[in-house]
């Protein structure tokens, strides 16, 4: 076996190859989605220690219930729905919970009506997608989903109003997406809502829409959420009308509403350690020993990742596939409102998209070692090479989208959110990517030429 065959490569995953031999796809779009993403997905499951039965089950469910809702395979010269999920507008993303070695994925459900006159703002596809997931997991509860869906996304009349009045413009058109946490032989579903279009259609602010919908949730199902919600509202109001932080989206667990967590996400344009400290402490409101201990860890992560300080704005457009990013995105935070906690619990996001991936990898590896996550520290860099064996590992700056951190009961939680498209041997096996190759493409042309020789 040659040295090329011995190098890390997700396309060599045994489970991916077995399933590729036996699975059938109704069309070429779904087949391409499978071969583009499944190598990385299968390898990530293996690396995280999922047993072989779980790996087959997870990939089988993804093929059956998720791939059909990813829409046409993305190219630069074909029409497609652009999702806010990634800067390239692609509707699927894998992430890794580093502390628990758990895999999760997020996707924006898309169907044939998405973006057409029947559903110009992709309001409807998520219903069909959720129905599929509920058939596979009867524990999925949609009561809270129905509540936020009605309050934060446009209905048919509002959709028509947006079209007729041309109010959508360049605003975010993604309204909802789903995420699956893969654990205990099954999955837990979360839903995310972006109220930007609802705000445009109703004239109400995003902040008002989100907070009022949570107040209704408190009154109907979760009175114990009133206290953490009050603290968060006070913080947002205290930041003032000129604040660089603003509410962006909301998420909830699709479980019994009385036990479900709700998360409110803020975008922070000021990229600095001081801004992140303010987000973490809620402007000094979180003063517990645990919160302050975590603050030291956040400073440590900041010193390792070294995001360049700036005042950043989230771009209104999307990057063409294959573009090398040259941008710094804003920071982000979510505040979890729990029925058993009077204080909102923050999870901060280091926006690493556009930063050198080798530098980020080395920073994460150092942090893993300090946390005692030895196995992950030893394997993380090789795993990334396996996911993208034909990328220039020295110069790539598009693989790590976010690194998130939270801290609960003395335990650090970190997740990484990774670019998930055209993994493994895709660049040398399937032609759609080749037509976009240029000297600036993240795939190293010398390696590509060598592989194709």
Curated annotation (Swiss-Prot):
A single GO molecular function term of this UniProt record: tryptophan dimethylallyltransferase activity
Matching Pfam families: Trp_DMAT
EC code(s) of this entry: 2.5.1.34
Binding site for L-tryptophan: 84-85, 93, 194, 248
Enzyme class: transferase
Residues annotated as transmembrane: none
Pathway entry: Alkaloid biosynthesis
Subunit and interaction comment: Homodimer.
UniProt name for this protein: Tryptophan dimethylallyltransferase cnsF
Taxonomic source organism: Penicillium expansum
Lineage: Eukaryota, Fungi, Dikarya, Ascomycota, Pezizomycotina
Underlying gene: cnsF
